[in-house]
Amino acid sequence: MAEDQRKVWLIAEFLEDSFVGCSVFYDYEDRERVARSYRIVDYNTGKLLHHVFVSRAFLDDHAEAEIVPALQDLALVGCLRIAGTRRVTVKSQMIEIEVGA
């Protein structure tokens, strides 16, 4: 579990570094399907900019040292910018953007 916590922190740090001027909040979601939920909020306005779900499979399939490179390879930051406030789910080898909203 300690390794999982480190992975969760690495993802939060990656998002904070990628979205300067924003706060990143994370918490548990459905343990069966989604491991963590991250909300990226504009620090000045409090407006929700992005909502990311990171699957249990992603955390399980990537070693700690692979987390950030895998997010970069999946182009997570670009996907978030395209998605806006729509939900983005990071799966083991792909990213899904919620349709609509």
What is each PLM-predicted segment?
Residues 89-95:
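C-terminal interaction segments
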Residues 43-69:
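Acidic, low-complexity, intrinsically disordered interaction modules
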Residues 13-53:
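Amphipathic, interaction-prone secondary-structure segments
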